[in-house]
Amino acid sequence: MALLQIAEPGQSAAPHQHRLAVGIDLGTTNSLVAAVRSGVANTLPDEDSQHSLPSVVRYTQDSVLVGREAEAFSAQDPQNTIVSIKRFMGRSLEDIQSGDQTLPYIFEASENGLPIFVTPSGKVNPVQISSEILKPLVARAELTLGGTLEGVVITVPAYFDDAQRQGTKDAASLTGVKVLRLLNEPTAAAIAYGLDSGQEGVIAVYDLGGGTFDISILRLNKGVFEVLATGGDSALGGDDFDHMLQAYFAEQWQVSSASASMNRKMQIEARRVKEALTESAETTASVVDDAGTKLTLTVTRELFDSLIAKLVKKTISSCRRALRDAGVSNDEVLETVMVGGSTRVPLVRQEVESFMGKTPLTSIDPDRVVAIGAAIQADILVGNKPESDLLLLDVIPLSLGIETMGGLVEKVVSRNTTIPVARAQEFTTFKDGQTAMAFHVVQGERELVADCRSLARFTLKGIPPLAAGAAHIRVTFQVDADGLLSVTAMEKSTGVQASIQVKPSFGLSDEEIGSMLKDSMANAKEDITRRMLAEKQVEAARVLESLNAALSKDSDLLSVDERGVIEANMASLAQIASEDDADAIEAAIEVLDTATQDFAAKRMDNSIRLALKGQSVDNI
């Protein structure tokens, strides 16, 4: 939907004026920029007629090289030539260094544990490096279109978490360009194909790029793109195919401890071999080692298929899980859209066709389709197509909620809820006179906080010191169109509030999400039992807390024997509540309730007597 432009009174908003906006596919291996010109969306080439820009940045003492210029030095200066920066976005240095791949870069950890690259130009972080890739794309667009951009739509993998999405926005901010929206890559592809074909029904978008894999199941209906379910892996892509070949080269050539330069040479050759085998059944790998010896090796497509078979099967498993989440079968999928350069690999297409039961769509260049979809969306958002009723409804992959007493999870936004979304729920205080409340935001499907993923914590202060349960705190979860989560807590009588924008530092891979969902199903019965126990334990604690306060205030209303009976039942409840029997706790609460009924009546009578003291009958 278009962003409305409002003019001052007496000034024209120039509705006929075409506003400049582009879509950018900020990829792991290559990046592209696209625009709608004369009603047609296409990628914009550079002065050398190259549409893609390698996502490579090289730092020297006095310059920063980007794209092919930087890529040319990747073998001779791998330490300062940074590739696949998208893989580093939002990940901790510890996580990066614990991976299987040996990285040639010099790292330092920032205060929050995120990676800092030490280069001849100084210390830089992934956000700054990403901005260097965006700069020439923006410059290319403005030169080609002949003006300043009013905004861009940048695509991101569906499983980028909040920190990764915010980092992408920050990178764009460093270039001085306005981000109209972050758009999930599969959704962008659906826009490109949906507008071209005009189909309605269920479509699968299989997106295998250089560094990430996403599968999205979408329903197209009267211009509405609804993502029914998503899946994928933020650390699986064509780069991993290259790594399998690279490891095979090292084994065959008996390269046990290769230098960074040799590793980079093998990596480049692995990519070339992969691309050659897309068209040919056989090719020869050739690398000159550090000693000047030329190493060669014949590689067949059959061998390559055997090396990558497990990785391709992982993507099919994600497809199967996404279909199950969406509640649709293979037969209901009208088309499968192929996105990403890695979908050119014959084995990938064969496995997808075999699983889906139909030939996948490849009519739009899989390398360009995401950028084209982003350009179409940018054209709409900037107001060039105000009549367009295109809607995008992405979904939340895992439920969002907060911790309540007893370590329980209260889900506020359920998984597979379409975004943008806002949900609110009311909570109250546990203790008399409570003036603050701590909030713990979690993600997951389990019933207990210990089994879910922690996202953020914040505290609401300034709650009026009322009796337990008297204060009303409204908690609102808002997830915007870019998938960023904001949580706000407000005390209703005073209006005092606190909020937090959730920016977790770590993303979730497809395996982790799948594992969390599998665990929730496998432990559903046990989780409900544990939840019921925790709820009864919380209720017991509340009863004992309330009764202790009452005894402290009005114990003089009881005889020694009456108080002894109550305290004995309280001790019994406290003992039973520490054990794992919800039914026994409930029974003990009922026994204590019966034992305190006379005490409650005496307190009520006493309160009425005190309230009426000194009042005449006429006043009453």
Curated annotation (Swiss-Prot):
InterPro entries: ATPase_NBD (IPR043129), Heat_shock_70_CS (IPR018181), HSP70_C_sf (IPR029048), HSP70_peptide-bd_sf (IPR029047), Hsp_70_fam (IPR013126), ISC_FeS_clus_asmbl_HscA (IPR010236). NCBIfam families: HscA, PRK05183.1. Belongs to the heat shock protein 70 family. It comes from Shewanella pealeana (strain ATCC 700345 / ANG-SQ1). Chaperone involved in the maturation of iron-sulfur cluster-containing proteins. Has a low intrinsic ATPase activity which is markedly stimulated by HscB. The keyword tRNA processing does not apply. This is Chaperone protein HscA homolog. HAMAP family: HscA. GO terms for biological process: iron-sulfur cluster assembly. Gene3D superfamilies: 1.20.1270.10, 3.30.420.40, Actin, Chain A, domain 4, Substrate Binding Domain Of DNAk, Chain A, domain 1. Keywords: ATP-binding, Chaperone, Nucleotide-binding. The keyword Transport does not apply. One of its GO terms (molecular function) is ATP hydrolysis activity.
